């Protein structure tokens, strides 16, 4: 009898240890990110992220290759044209617009889209309704820029323009270092990007109309870091669907940015 009790205690301790190990996979919890602000002495122009900016999401798993995306965003960028390394800003992708395009079948893609939004707790499921404050809290995937380096040019005014239709364009490549917040958990992430500044013909280098930001390589988000897992319509963990992770649903998502930001007066 004593031996049985001892075994049970040891098993219980082991189980707790496993749970603790799983818990440590979670990234630090956060409801928001600290503002991404430029240095006080920097001379910057503000750009507003165009509402139609988008992301593409690629999730290859052994049994299913999920393809998805978002098509709404918000945020701002503050750009110092003569010292691009001083650029700061925040981009927020609207996860309520996330849609999958895995199957090429409207009904199947609609169902999969519903599941994805439920896992992220940004929309009600087929059964059940999430509290509005939970959906509002999780609505955006947020990336805040903390530093910029590996610039192909640090001074935009010294970059020779090229032609793109009627526009003149000055392009630089860079690596941004920042924080990524998804589903209440934040991680540090880098983004390798190409930034193209568009001008009316003959316009000064510090007077662009808008800029675009496109990923050179995807930014990876790991589901476990952000506590993204199977959930029902009430936000409860759907343990019966855990076998999908790593088989039909990849354990990570590769995110590609396609942003436009318009110069502000």
Language-model features, listed with the residues they occupy:
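Low-complexity, acidic/polar, glycine-enriched regions of mature
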Residues: 18-265
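Sec-dependent bacterial lipoprotein signal peptides
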Residues: 1-16
């Amino acid at each position: 009898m004593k031996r049985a009790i001892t075994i049970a205690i040891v098993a219980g301790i082991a189980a707790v240890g496993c749970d603790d190990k799983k818990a440590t996979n979670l990234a630090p919890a956060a409801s928001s990110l600290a503002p991404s602000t430029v240095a006080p002495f920097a001379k910057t122009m503000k750009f507003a992220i165009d509402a139609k900016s988008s992301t593409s999401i690629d999730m290859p798993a052994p049994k299913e290759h999920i393809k998805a995306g978002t098509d709404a965003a918000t945020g701002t960028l503050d750009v110092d044209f003569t010292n691009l390394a001083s650029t700061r800003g925040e981009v927020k992708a609207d996860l309520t617009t996330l849609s999958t395009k895995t199957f090429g079948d409207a009904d199947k893609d609609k169902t999969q889209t519903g599941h994805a939004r439920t896992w992220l707790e940004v929309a009600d499921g087929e059964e059940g309704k999430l509290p509005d404050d939970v959906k509002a809290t999780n609505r955006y995937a947020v990336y805040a820029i903390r530093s910029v380096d590996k610039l192909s040019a640090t001074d935009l005014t010294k970059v020779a323009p090229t032609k793109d239709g009627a526009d003149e364009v000055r392009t630089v490549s860079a690596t941004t270092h920042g924080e990524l917040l998804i589903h209440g958990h934040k991680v540090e992430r880098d983004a390798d990007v190409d930034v193209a500044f568009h001008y009316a013909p003959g316009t000064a280098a510090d007077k662009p109309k808008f800029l675009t930001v496109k990923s050179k390589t995807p930014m990876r988000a790991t589901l476990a870091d952000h506590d993204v897992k199977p959930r029902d319509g009430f936000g409860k963990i759907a343990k019966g669907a855990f076998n999908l992770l790593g088989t039909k649903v990849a354990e990570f998502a590769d995110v590609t940015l396609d942003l436009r930001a318009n110069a502000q007066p």
